[in-house]
Amino acid sequence: EVASIARTIGRAARLNEDLIEALALCHDIGHPPYGHAGEDALSECMVDIGGFSHNQFGLTIVEEIEIRYPDFPGLNLSLEVLEGQARRVDKSGTGPRPALEVQLVDAADSMTYDAHDTDDALKLRLVDLDELENLGLIRNCLKYVDSQHAGLDSGMRRKALVHRLLDLQVVDLLDTLGKSLDQRQFQSVDDVRASEFLIEPSSELGEMKRELESFLYQNVYRHEKLIAMRSEAQSRIQELYAKYVADPSLFPEKYLPRAHSIGISRMAGEYIAGMTDRFFEQTFERITGNQIRG
């Protein structure tokens, strides 16, 4: 979805669509099981060897781990893709700006997170719609939904809200970005890097996004139910990591050469980070003998 949204905006702005798609597909490729909770757990486990970063691991995957050619490791991606993965958007204002395509993927990622985290919060009943309607962005979206589709049941109204949240952000960014690029008239990527420019929503929508994100942080991400789930997930990752470090024979045989090359501790982190949630849980139960409660 991030790739689709970013390409749509990039096409209208006449940016490099192929680069946008490659960057979007690489964007979260390095995430371990359980997303950011898993990343924090692995980083804590690996603190003595430099920690763990899903961005850096994403680079490791496409440059070293994936083997598609007989003459060299990695996927043979272009310098622009690799640079985009390495140089994510830093809004501190220091250092050169990343390419516009990198910035656009970051903006599209923010859009989808806001929309789907709102959706998940409602589906899990962590918050209710009455609470969300106090927020300007949600109130704006629901007003539109109700004007177009009167009498929707709660489930369909929620889905329509999510669609409108995405649509509103896309239209806003298309308008804002188009005007900004017309004013700036960048001639090269070096012009972008040397500027103070960042792809961001309009000031009005940006303020409403920040209000929504603050609400989600306080009332969803810090919800006691999610904190408990996060803690359990992190404990499982730490337990399985310790098992692999203590007994490297648990690694599949084909991973042993890399384990000898980069060290057992780093290999344990990489191997776990490459798992899906489902495969991790199956592996955890098999190796530890502990059943994960549904």
Regions found by a protein language model. Give the residues of each.
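Aspartate-rich (DDxxD/NDxxD/DxxxD) Mg2+/diphosphate-binding motifs
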Residues: L19-D48, N55
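Histidine-centered, transition-metal-coordinating active-site segments
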Residues: E1-I9, R14-D18, G38, F52-G294
